[in-house]
């Protein structure tokens, strides 16, 4: 499981940072890639990676500002060129209006897609648990921005314990159907009368990962709730230390506010993104160092950077 950042800038493309988009790579878990936001130029950024557009099965949009959605029609069209290899439908989750935006762009440009898009639109009254599969659950909550904006909490369900096959073999259990029964948690009786207790040969379930990905937001308690105990919190850092007033007026956060959210939520790691173009080079280093004074496990990410979870 990895996060790769396709765009880490704020507002408009810059030389060092494209606008917002990241992918959550779940290839080992479910052979899928999930995209979060799709700003202008996202498909160009993908060309610099190993990401296959047809592997992108779900797209989560935080809000309808252009730097988070203007790349979506282009990406969907480019994805169509690979659809003949593997016909794969796509789910798009986002605020009310995302369907109209996408369909209008495709219709007016005469674009035809050889796959279906399933839209899931939300307003403030329909948030909470928005998606569930056998391996993942996704929650959404309203943040505090200048327009309706969501944050997402991706929860991996606990992983089953693994079978200690070597110990089972040493106990005299023949490989075959009995192995399968023990793996499924069933106690078995051997021909010599000994009972094999399944739980003695299966490790404890492994806790699933929690990944919190927030859209643009002022400092808000909703961010804390979404990030409670998260393994990774991705939080915007449009402004730096001392910029709290201007951040609030524009519906954004500073690096220090993001660090405080991570601390209050008891998150394990904080990744800062959505950085204003006025922060470059040493300024970015200082932004990260300042945040570390509040939350030590902080990192300010760069475009195309991959982070393991």
From Swiss-Prot:
Q: What is its EC number?
A: 3.1.26.11
Q: Which residues bind Zn(2+) 1?
A: 63, 65, 145, 216
Q: Name one GO molecular function term.
A: zinc ion binding
Q: How is the cofactor bound?
A: Binds 2 Zn(2+) ions.
Keywords assigned: Endonuclease, Hydrolase, Metal-binding, Nuclease, tRNA processing, Zinc
Parts of the chain that traverse the membrane: none
The cofactor(s) it depends on are: Zn(2+)
User: Could you name the domain of life of the organism this protein comes from?
Assistant: Bacteria
- What function does the entry list? Zinc phosphodiesterase, which displays some tRNA 3'-processing endonuclease activity. Probably involved in tRNA maturation, by removing a 3'-trailer from precursor tRNA.
NCBIfam families (UniProt xref): PRK00055.1-3 (NF000801), RNase_Z (TIGR02651)
What is the recorded name of this protein?
Ribonuclease Z
């Amino acid at each position: 499981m990895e996060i790769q950042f396709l765009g880490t800038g704020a507002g408009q493309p810059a030389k060092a940072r494209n606008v917002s988009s990241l992918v959550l790579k779940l290839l080992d878990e479910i052979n899928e890639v999930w995209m979060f936001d799709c700003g202008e130029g996202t498909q160009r950024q993908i060309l610099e990676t190993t990401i296959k557009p047809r592997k992108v099965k779900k797209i989560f949009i935080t809000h309808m500002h252009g730097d988070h959605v203007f790349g979506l029609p282009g990406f969907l069209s480019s994805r169509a060129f690979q659809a003949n290899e593997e016909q794969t439908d796509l789910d798009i989750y986002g605020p009310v209006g995302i369907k109209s935006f996408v369909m209008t762009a495709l219709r007016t440009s005469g674009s035809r897609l050889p796959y279906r898009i399933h839209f899931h639109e939300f307003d403030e009254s329909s948030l909470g648990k928005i998606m569930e599969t056998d391996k993942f659950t996704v929650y959404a909550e309203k943040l505090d921005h200048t327009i309706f904006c969501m944050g997402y909490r991706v929860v991996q369900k606990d992983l089953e314990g693994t079978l200690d096959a070597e110990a089972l073999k040493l106990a005299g259990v023949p490989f075959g159907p009995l192995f399968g029964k023990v793996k499924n948690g069933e106690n078995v009786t051997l021909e010599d009368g000994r009972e094999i207790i399944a739980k003695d040969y299966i490790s404890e379930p492994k806790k699933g990962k929690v990944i919190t990905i927030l859209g643009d937001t002022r400092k808000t308690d909703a961010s804390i709730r979404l990030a409670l105990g998260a393994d990774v919190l991705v939080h915007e850092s449009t402004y730096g230390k001392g910029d709290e007033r201007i951040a609030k007026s524009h519906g954004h956060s500073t690096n220090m506010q993001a660090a405080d959210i991570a601390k209050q939520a008891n998150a394990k790691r904080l990744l800062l993104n959505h950085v204003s173009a006025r922060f470059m080079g040493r300024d970015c280093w200082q932004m990260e160092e300042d945040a570390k004074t509040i939350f030590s496990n902080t990192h300010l990410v760069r475009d195309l950077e991959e982070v393991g979870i």
